[in-house]
Regions:
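N-terminal pre-domain/capping segments
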Residues: 1-65, 69-88, 278-291, 301-304, ...
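Active-site beta-loop-alpha junctions enriched in small/polar residues
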Residues: 6-10, 31-33, 66-68, 106-108, ...
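Acidic (Asp/Glu)-rich catalytic clusters
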Residues: 16-23, 41-62, 89-97, 126-134, ...
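Conserved, mostly hydrophobic/aromatic
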Residues: 18, 64, 82, 93, ...
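Non-cysteine beta-strand/loop elements that form the S-adenosyl-L-methionine
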Residues: 24-29, 59-63, 169-175, 204-216
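Active-site acidic/histidine proton-transfer and metal-coordination neighborhood
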Residues: 71-170
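C-terminal helical cap(s) of enzyme catalytic domains, especially alpha/beta-barrels
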Residues: 262-279
Length: 312
């Protein structure tokens, strides 16, 4: 398991923040999360990111797409801005050598899933055309609020099939979202069933990363409210999800409020490691700085060789 979190600072500072927090992996934005305007990144900054990553031994990098994106929107202007921004995000992620771009599909705004699917599929196809050999485009499951797409594994599978099982279309599972949408991943038996369903519908080889968050809201509430490690309703049960053997080796990114309300930090990273240690009855996993090459191969190439796309 690689322990990381969503860190501030963008391309210039996120790596150093992650390192200071004792993380093995980092998730970041490559633009302001609150604005549509996409910056023109200096090629020197993109190159410097790759070099700094090697220096710090950060083993996995994910870029989170803009929260404003709505690839399912029936509103033409909003939809077109979303498609353009996702393309630009993919370009930047490939340039810095990120293993994944994680995105929220969006909401059909009451228009229904099937009409939305007809909009989402070509948008994803455009983004995937820009995908490098090492960067995955990862659909994130949702808590199921309103008309959001991705509330169930079946909805993610429908997108996967609509894209003809594209070899670089992956999945990011968020523990809080799973719990809120009715998947009790704090129970080993239920988690086994969930992962078996994912394997059957899409393939576990397509699961590229995790968001590990506790939940302020109860099971099946369809409300997306992340909580700090050990402070929410999932509690110690979050360790069941974190330590499942079929998730071994994946980057686990925190997206929690943080000790001081400013997001993932050193204290939350420590609690995540300790929870994993208790769940696996082992000593707390320590930062593995300096082993970036081997870990990157484990996260990327080793898992991709197990792809089921040819046989499905």
């Amino acid at each position: 398991m690689l322990f990381g979190g969503h860190c501030p600072g963008g391309i210039k500072k996120a790596l150093d923040n992650a390192h200071a927090f004792g993380m093995d992996a980092v998730q970041l934005f490559v633009q302001s999360p609150r604005a549509w305007r996409f910056p023109e990144h200096d090629p020197g900054d993109l190159k410097a990111f790759r070099k700094r990553r090697e220096e710090l031994g950060i083993q996995a990098v994910a870029v989170h797409a803009l929260y404003l994106l709505n690839l399912a929107s029936p509103k033409k202007d909003f939809y077109e801005k979303s498609v353009t921004t996702l393309r630009s995000t993919m370009d930047a992620a490939c340039a810095i050598g990120a293993e994944a771009v994680v995105f929220h599909v969006g909401s059909h705004l009451g228009d229904g899933f099937e009409p939305a699917l007809e909009r989402v599929a070509p948008a994803l196809a455009e983004a995937l055309e820009r995908c490098s050999d090492t960067t995955w485009l990862c659909m994130e499951n949702t808590a199921g609020t309103g008309g959001t797409i991705g509330r169930s594994l079946e909805e993610l599978a429908a997108l996967y099939e609509a894209l003809d099982r594209h070899p670089r279309l992956g999945v990011c599972l968020d523990s809080c979202h799973l719990f809120a949408s009715g998947y009790d991943v704090t129970d080993r038996g239920e988690l086994d069933k969930t992962l078996a369903q994912l394997d059957d519908l899409i393939g576990l080889d397509r699961l590229r990363c995790l968001h590990v968050n506790d939940s302020k809201m109860p099971l099946g509430s369809n409300r997306d409210r992340h909580d700090n490690i050990g402070e929410g309703l999932m509690g110690e049960g979050l360790g069941v999800f974190l330590a499942h053997p079929k998730l071994k080796g994946l980057p686990a990114y925190l997206e929690v409020p943080g000790t001081d309300g400013h997001g993932p930090d050193a204290e939350q990273t420590k609690k995540l490691r300790e929870l994993y240690a208790r769940a696996t009855k082992a000593s707390p996993a320590m930062p593995t700085s300096g082993r970036a090459g081997s870990a990157r191969a484990s996260v990327g190439n080793d898992r991709s060789t197990r792809s089921k796309s040819a046989g499905r």
